[in-house]
């Protein structure tokens, strides 16, 4: 699940079971094209030894500019093989800005 809170993008995911799982890579791009995506984060497996029950994960991302961003999750097994999960997830990011104008009044 991906949500925008006005300042950061929150990415949440969960696993039912992790067998031989080393960790996860998160990727981000401005378009829905994985070949243009950049690795933004590695999250190690929360399961000791890469075997056992599942876990929940979260990552806070701060996109450099507003617009639509696409995210991909990939898992890496203990042999170093990466599996990218589709579909990608898109979210529109719009920074909230406040403009302060000087107060001008009659004296």
Stretches found by the model and what they are:
Residues 61-81:
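Beta-strand-rich modules
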Residues 7-11, 22:
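Structural beta-strand segments of beta-rich domains
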Residues 4, 15, 27-32, 75-77, ...:
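Residue-level signal for short segments within beta-strands and strand-turn junctions
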Residues 76-98:
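Extracellular fibronectin type III
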Residues 23-66, 84:
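Recognizes extended acidic, P/S/T-rich segments that occur
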Residues 102:
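Conserved functional hotspot residues at active sites or interaction interfaces
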Residues 5, 16-20, 65:
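Short glycine/proline-centered coil/turn motifs in the loop regions
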